[in-house]
Amino acid sequence: MEALTFPRYSPDDIVAYLRSHVLVGAEARNLTKADLFATLKPEVLHMIFIRILQKVYGIRLEHFYMMPVNVDIVYPQIFEGFLPVCNLYIHMERFLPVCRVNDFQMSDVINPKAKRTARFLSGILNFVHFRECRREAYLELQLNYKSAMEKHQQLETANQELEMKLEKLNTVPVEQQAEFKQLSDDIQELEQLLSHDYRRKTAALQEVISQKKSDITERTRKLNELKVTMATLKEEQEQLKSKIVESPEELKNYKELMKETVKKLKKSKQEVIEKYEGYRDLVEVLPSCQLEVQLYQKKMERQAANVERLASVLSEVRNLEDQLESAQIELKKGKTDEMSLKRLVTAKHERLSTAEIRIKKKREDVEQYKHTVFEYFNRVQEKRGVVYDKVTAIQKEIQQMRFKIQQLNESAEEEEMKAKEIYQNLKAGLEKRHDSLIKTAKNYAASREDKIAELQKGLLRVQSPGSSS
């Protein structure tokens, strides 16, 4: 039995715990260490067991004096004195296995021993301490759960009320539904028109841009071809330069001719530069060279062919300039169309902004109404909190009154127990007195009969000698 699942308490700890946690009032003050360990009193141990059962299971005091109703007893008055002890043993036999004590016997109630009682009380105190700890945690959890449920219900009700109010606020009044519908239709129509115009104008601008890009690529291709032809002409000129015969007369005549041609070329070059400054890179001026070729008419023919080619190039350049001017005119037209579209878009945006201002104003009105509703709700909540505080204060007062009533009931029960004990003692004393009186009466009657018999015998003796004489 030494391998226990609970600690063994010292007698001082057991007495201190019983005084502070189990017993109250005069019972706690009158309890001493000698009542449980030095000279163990069964009635004190019975009182402690009863208080522990009342604390743990809530068993009332009159239950220990109740006769079982499921058994037929012929003479119940015989069991009246033994009934509280028997009920106490039955309850303790059920309770102590919970405290990990499995060897409780009837003799531990009728004739208790100090060591076994200390072990039983150690197990009981360990269980009571564990129960109090778990009970506090459970009560705290229960209180938190109750408060959370109340708060949850309050929040649910408040949420439902607010949802109803929000639905009421979000619904458009009947007198404003037509205006609201008209505004929404106008907004949708404006959005559709703006998106359609924007798509159409963007498509047109994309087409114009793609066309301009194709024209620019074509012109760059033609310019590259002209550059290639000019490079070939330069190569031919260099080849002809190497074949020229250096004769002074022919050179002089050739120089004069070349001067005239150079003047003509310079004049034509000046005209080309003045008219086509933007295409200076396309038409490169032939370098002034001292061509001393008089005997080669083929070279002059080639130069004439080059002049014709230059004229054709200039005509192409003029055509390109005309095309560029027409493209610029079309671009200006596109810009004017874009400006008109921008004006239309700004007008539509102004209409949208006015509609948004109206909607914003309505939303502000709704928000203001919501704010007033929330303020009213907060005031109601404050009033409700004040009422709740009053109710809690009243409930605390009720609990205090109940606690006082319970204390009064306990004191009344204690007085009743004392009165019953006094009654039982008086009854036992009277019964003993009656028994002694009956015994004395019987003894007196027996002695009287003996004396009467002796007197009769004496009389007979006295009478017998007289008769004989």
Swiss-Prot record:
It is found in: Cytoplasm; Nucleus; Chromosome, Centromere, Kinetochore; Cytoplasm, Cytoskeleton, Microtubule organizing center, Centrosome. GO terms for molecular function: microtubule binding; protein-containing complex binding. One of its GO terms (biological process) is kinetochore organization. Its main location: cytoplasm. Keywords: Cell cycle, Cell division, Centromere, Chromosome, Coiled coil, Cytoplasm, Cytoskeleton, Kinetochore, Mitosis, Nucleus. Gene3D superfamilies: Ncd80 complex, Nuf2 subunit. InterPro entries: Kinetochore_Nuf2_N, Nuf2_N_sf. GO terms for cellular component: centrosome; cytoplasm; Ndc80 complex; nucleus. The keyword Cytoplasm applies. It holds the Pfam family Nuf2. Residues 135-444 form a coiled coil. Acts as a component of the essential kinetochore-associated NDC80 complex, which is required for chromosome segregation and spindle checkpoint activity. Required for kinetochore integrity and the organization of stable microtubule binding sites in the outer plate of the kinetochore. The NDC80 complex synergistically enhances the affinity of the SKA1 complex for microtubules and may allow the NDC80 complex to track depolymerizing microtubules. PANTHER family: KINETOCHORE PROTEIN NUF2, MEMBRALIN/KINETOCHORE PROTEIN NUF2. Belongs to the NUF2 family. Component of the NDC80 complex, which is composed of at least NDC80/HEC1 and CDCA1. This is Kinetochore protein Nuf2. It comes from Gallus gallus.
